[in-house]
Amino acid sequence: MTTVNLAAYRFVSLDSIEQWRPLITARCNALGLRGTILLAPEGINLFIAGSRGATDAFVDYLRHDPLFEGKFADLPFKESLSDSQPFRRMLVRLKREIITMKKPAIKPELGRAPSVDARMLKAWLDRGHDDAGRPVVMLDTRNAFEVDVGTFDNALDYRIDKFSQFPGVIEANRADLEGKTVVSFCTGGIRCEKAAIHMKDVGIENVYQLEGGILKYFEEVGGAHYHGDCFVFDYRTALNPQLAPTADVTCFACRAVVPADAQQSPLYVPGKSCPACHPGDQGRRADHRADPAHAA
């Protein structure tokens, strides 16, 4: 049976998350859903999967139940399909931030940086400049191991290990962005939204966020100006520009991404180890977990 995978986030002030947590958990369990929902005073970030009927029912619940006071009435969801359930369990977690930047003064609900949609961005990249004639710089806000799976052509990648490092690398590399149109991007939009707001706050001009992130770009225009796949924080590991799971897997031991060619190595033992587990190996290794707390 086909599994429906949903992702969504919203920055909005929430003051009842402690009361909501058991109620949302009970509803998800009753519907047979699995995944992770993060609740914080600044908003919601969720990745869930289940049957079509279950996911539709949950969307209706979030958008229309009086419990949520209309805060999610028009919450957009990104959808993809898989042949199996990518999550092992259902978790509803309370967090300080739905994506950790350690910049509590940022309040995206009070005003976002401008956004550019997939079709407009493709037009800019086709031409090599934006509508004002400025060169366009793609800025990857994701962790280094995610970038290694795939990214936009010629994107700036500052090899961060966690999103809270982003403000520091921007301060150190401001010259890369001056006089250009900067488009921040990430998997689903949440990190590039916070990143764009931060850049505007520190005085960097002509900053945009990619609306809906890489996954929305794939959905609308495919893989134009992009090379590789997109890492996702679940057991699918990566999606190609057609939003289909790839042959990449995540190593059970070290959590590195193991592409198809590395799976042919004698050092790869499914469920036990991979080439990156061994000292001296030069393959990709990352200290990460398949945890949406790091994502989108």
UniProtKB/Swiss-Prot annotation:
One of its GO terms (biological process) is tRNA modification. The keyword Lyase does not apply. It catalyses: uridine(34) in tRNA + AH2 + O2 = 5-hydroxyuridine(34) in tRNA + A + H2O. Keywords: Oxidoreductase, tRNA processing. It comes from the Bacteria. The active site is at 186 (cysteine persulfide intermediate). InterPro entries: Rhodanese-like_dom, Rhodanese-like_dom_sf, TrhO, TRHO_N. Its EC number is 1.14.-.-. It is an enzyme of class 1 (oxidoreductase). One of its GO terms (molecular function) is oxidoreductase activity, acting on paired donors, with incorporation or reduction of molecular oxygen. The keyword Zinc-finger does not apply. Residues 132-226 form the Rhodanese domain. It holds the Pfam family Rhodanese. Catalyzes oxygen-dependent 5-hydroxyuridine (ho5U) modification at position 34 in tRNAs. Belongs to the TrhO family. HAMAP family: TrhO. NCBIfam families: PRK05320.1 (NF003703). This is tRNA uridine(34) hydroxylase. The lineage of its organism: Bacteria, Pseudomonadati, Pseudomonadota, Betaproteobacteria, Burkholderiales.
